[in-house]
Amino acid sequence: MEFKVPQPMTQRPIYTLPENPTIRQLRETAVKAMRDMLTIQWSTGKEIRYNKKGAVSGKNYYHDPGQLYCGLPYADGQTNLYVWLEHYNMETGEMTFDGDGVWLNDHLGNTCAGSLMWGWSAVCRSLTGVFINYNMVKKYGVLPVGDYKYNTDITTYYDHKTRDICDENGQEKMFECYAQIQLGDGITSTTTLHTMMSIIDAVVVRDENGKIDGEQSYITLQDQAAGKGKEFRTEEHDGLIYNYSGKINFHAPFNWLWEKAYIPITTAELQGLIPYEKAWVNFAGAGITVEQLIGGVFQSNYPMCLIKTFATDAQGNKTLLHKRYFNRGDVGTGRARAYRIISDDQEAFQAAVAKLPSGEYTLSAEVTVATGEIFTPVSFSYSK
């Protein structure tokens, strides 16, 4: 059988929703946002190298010219799809970079938890982070699915593991919590050091006494995972070959979830506890001088993915002055919702402005948020 291959992404996905979306629409959109990161087809004209840290320490990943890849690479930078698309040719699907070979750890690619967080962030504004640990529950906008017990006083990662939670609640209780998983919910385990998202509502099979059958009951998952050097796993789904390390259609029986000590997690928006809100970006500052642009605050209710500032001359020629990417860590610190050029990029920005020829310009900023929308919260005339 001859399989089709994924096609290049021909336009930027935008995850806007109507004024009063249903919870189901939120969930479906979160699944799609994460899946777009896992299934984008790409190639490279030069070797791209990654060196892994953390859970996959010491492994080097190589992406070779002429090879078709699918999905963002596993990388510690943990940035959104829109950062990747900054280097992506939508006509050919090829990534382009400066240099002979590129070490991309700094900003391109994602981890399992980062992928889940950015998928959720397309519709959820309550998150401040997603981590592969137990103590994130009710701490970063992450909530439990079901009523399993956990200790909210635990603040250190190794003090309380998901295996302990499963054992303390018991298999029957955890099965009942797994049974409440809906598409868009996540699972996390400190045993496997992994986080995934369900793409279906749990399929639950009970015996004649109402007890859940752990082998027949299951969820189906998607995830961002790490490859092994030049060996990339291949998966067929819907007639497509996905030549990368993540999974997009992984069958997980409840018995397996229990064995691997997964606990189910979700967000307030996906549970209908707080309302959906349209994305907005504003600029807190006068924004009529370069100094005010540098010192002002870009604010958003959703995580920002990147900010670009431009100088546009009278002929409409646009010069990029500076670019700032935001990663999962920036979401956790709050910088992805409140950012000042003066805090990180003042010197580079001022150097770029100094290089502009004399003339009349419009200085402006474009902000991309996790919904995919692009806002221009500040624009003003500038004479040099």
Regions found by a protein language model. Give the residues of each.
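Active-site signature of cysteine proteases
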Residues: 200-273
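N-terminal capping segments
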Residues: 2-125
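Solvent-exposed serine/threonine-rich low-complexity stretches and specific carbohydrate-binding patches
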Residues: 319-342
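Surface-exposed, short loops/turns at beta-strand junctions within beta-sandwich domains
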Residues: 352-359
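Extended low-complexity, serine/threonine- and proline-enriched intrinsically disordered segments
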Residues: 299-324
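...with weaker cross-activation on analogous glycine-rich loops/strands in unrelated enzymes
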Residues: 127-228
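Short, compositionally biased P/S/T/A/G/V-rich stretches that sit at domain boundaries
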Residues: 261-293
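Short beta-strand elements
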Residues: 372-384
